[in-house]
Amino acid sequence: MGGGGMFEEIGCFDPNAPAEMTAESSFSPSEPPPTITVIGSNSNSNCSLEDLSAFHLSPQDSSLPASASAYAHQLHINATPNCDHQFQSSMHQTLQDPSYAQQSNHWDNGYQDFVNLGPNHTTPDLLSLLQLPRSSLPPFANPSIQDIIMTTSSSVAAYDPLFHLNFPLQPPNGSFMGVDQDQTETNQGVNLMYDEENNNLDDGLNRKGRGSKKRKIFPTERERRVHFKDRFGDLKNLIPNPTKNDRASIVGEAIDYIKELLRTIDEFKLLVEKKRVKQRNREGDDVVDENFKAQSEVVEQCLINKKNNALRCSWLKRKSKFTDVDVRIIDDEVTIKIVQKKKINCLLFVSKVVDQLELDLHHVAGAQIGEHHSFLFNAKISEGSSVYASAIADRVMEVLKKQYMEALSANNGYHCYSSD
């Protein structure tokens, strides 16, 4: 192989250097022989001709002749004349070796691989034109492991399992292989995958990112409407006789019913205390005693009302789709007012209810207003009776509703008695 070819293939030759400097550096007797740099090693060593001869005569590895050939070309350029003469004699002995003829066919390929493995010492302009393949392998934190991999085989440094798949480069957002919120930690050449979420500290802030697992569930407008509708339905079922289905009417009737219940409770308390007072009178105890102390506010209020001759007063009203009942109690007098459609003879049935409640019926009046009949009953509470307004109204409504449904089923209506 010619000298010109050697100058072009060896990477350490500088074509821009002048000829005078090349000749002076090549034939200067005071300059020591050049040092050989081993790829992937941190130290350089000087080689002698004996080591070089032993290096060429080893037939075990096919890559050794290629290394020796490259070393010979480099010494031919930079060595002194004395070293050149000794080197030619050693090369003559090597060519006479029988094993050299068998291995010479592999020298050219090995030499080309060795040149490709050599470091590039060209100028920065040539480095800028070099395009390296994009590797998907992660970088190694330990430099010793990286040197071993680079010097072991050329296929390790040049082969990339994912390069032929032409995967796009990942954005520099701290993600690895497209997996979000994961980090890669290298510990003595071992890649450890761990979840970033487990290492985050709770700083008291509600994060609404993609990694948040807890999500607040807010009810929709449709669910709220269904919820309110169910609640109004339950409230309507608590009212004894609702008249309308709209929400405003349901709320109004519920308020009236609550007030009615409060009045009924007060009435019950007064009736109970009144019975106790009468029982004491029968046993001969003085009800009105200056030294008597009331055990409760109800008893005290009952005694005050009796001293002042206060009157018992209660009022209650019930409504349904076909009947309205109004009951008022003043002391021991009861007034019952009924308004109903012309379907049944309500006068007879209401009179039976008054008799069952132990009320003394004193007066009955009636009138016809359009398609409705109106009746007014005046009665008096018998002595010892504990009747109250809610009991009277509920009983009257129950009887009238039953008779009205029977009249509708039989399709037989009766006109109530009306007086002038």
Swiss-Prot record:
Tissue specificity: Flowers.
Gene3D superfamilies in the record: Helix-loop-helix DNA-binding domain (4.10.280.10)
Region listing for Disordered, in residue ranges: 196-216
SMART domains linked: HLH (SM00353)
Domain bHLH: 212-261
Keywords, sorted A to Z: DNA-binding, Nucleus, Transcription, Transcription regulation
Name of this chain's protein: Transcription factor bHLH89
Biased composition (Basic residues): 207-216
Compartments, as annotated in UniProt: Nucleus
Assembly notes: Homodimer.
Gene Ontology CC: one annotated term: nucleus
Chain's gene name: BHLH89
GO molecular function: DNA-binding transcription factor activity; E-box binding; protein dimerization activity
GO BP, sorted A to Z: anther wall tapetum development; callose deposition in cell wall; pollen development; regulation of DNA-templated transcription
Residue ranges of the TM segments: none
Organism: Arabidopsis thaliana (Mouse-ear cress)
InterPro entries: bHLH91-like, bHLH_dom, HLH_DNA-bd_sf, MYC1-like_bHLH
